[in-house]
């Protein structure tokens, strides 16, 4: 089961490649955000689950996303971090998972890659290392 935020990039790919998936929104349930994920939103309406704690028509605001990440953490048995900068929303989810004792798995990367420095930081501080995509099924 994938639980993610229906965001661009890795979130969208995770939702697309999973059999079972939950998308947690940082806006009203009928607001598609980001717009480029409209196809994914429509697909998940039919074969997944879309959740929001916000009323209908509420637009996405920056302060909604940390709250959304709290729900993602609460619904997760494990957290897999593919990429994260030090100050990314992913790190907010990591902190929520730590509060809930949700195990964290990270993909290590080269030191100079800024987009992934958060992963190396988390591994250095006790996160589990994930080096083979096939291991995801065993988590």
Regions found by a protein language model. Name each.
Residues 1-139:
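Glycine-biased, small-residue-rich flexible motifs in mid-sequence functional cores and linkers
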